[in-house]
Amino acid sequence: MRQATFLALMFLMLPLSGCFSPASTADGDSDDAYYPNIYDRHNLDWNWDGTYAMVLEPGPFEALEVQEATITVDTTGVWGGGPNSADVHLSYWLPSNTQAGEKVPVIAVVSPYFSYGQPGDESNPTNIVAAGRGEFIYDNFVPHGYALAQVAVFATEESTGCFDYRGDGEGLGIHSAVEWLGDQNWSNGNVAIYGKSYEGATAWEAAAQGSDHLKTIVPISGTTALAPLLYKNGSAEARSQIMHSNYGSSILDYDDDDLDNLCSDVVEGFLAGPTRYGLGELDPYMDNYYDERSHIDKALGKYNGSIYWVQGMQDWNVDPHQVFGGPPGTNWYQAYIDAGYEVAGMLGQWEHNYPDQWTKHNNQASGYGGEAIHNMTRWDWGQDLFEWMEYYLKGVGPKPTLHAQIQRNDGEWRIEETWPPLDADRVPLDLSLIHISEPT
């Protein structure tokens, strides 16, 4: 343990419009006595010994032995030529207080990455706590009375069916897992989905299904819509050609079980990337494919929970326009606030990483987050998320302040009511006036 100094310069921009005073909360009341005030966190001792952040106080409970479940889902008509039923496989760990009959909420990681890879070189299955994201939940939240669930999407690990790569079938399977987790006799009925990248996309897939059990999502650089991820300003990224086929080949076991994965949605996915890459906007046929894989627009008005958005502002994999972009004139972050959703954000100058992933917060060039590295890692992330989950999954503690924590390019952190600030000046830039020097 050593005293953290990463927030010592935090919030120096408080005089700016849209910032919160140190004693304010979303409800306008001071709740400083319940949790340490965010402005005092730089004075606290944080556990810097591991590879991820820890909560301030250890929990009183222990994790019970892993349990597994298989959920059979009616998939009639979901996949062209696919099976009429398919299984979703998941593993889960309960805290020891469930032995006394206490009901607990669930934090789920929903992923295609369990048993992912070629035979003989696969990642761990769902019944082993996943490195990083699973361990973070297991060590921080299970001792405080939360269940951890690891869910394999259709056609991955021991789940069956077709891998339609974020399509309607995958969304149905995720929804079925959320419903199952919320309906168990040990569950208090409240489920969260947490994860980065694809595992953040599954949070939006679940939100688009509108389960009453899904109370909050924490997408960390999570894809919100596939087409804007791969196609920007009329041009395509090279990876767009192989996204579906790359995942599809990595989940094959090269045995008879792979026959379940031969359905038209999979074939369409193999064609969609190269076709759109080659033809661009001259390819209207594939619009249906990409529309099916846009989830943030479908979730708006259907999802009935909160959102804690985490985004690397230097992320070139799932870049920030997935949060702050959208159709012309749309900023999804603000659109959800305007629609009445309870939204918070942690927006750092890291790349495609977690807020506390210090092992990755060290290799960014000047102008691409390098100036912020010294103050980048958020060792308070575990506590910050704990306070969020306590309120939205258990109804315990004060309502979190619904603000955006944003890191400047020089490393300083500040709080804004939203991002970008509503009173920001937008200055048009005429690119024809910019002179680009020839390389010497």
Kindly give the residue locations of the regions a language model identified:
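N-terminal cap/lid segment of alpha/beta-hydrolase-fold proteins
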Residues: 50-99
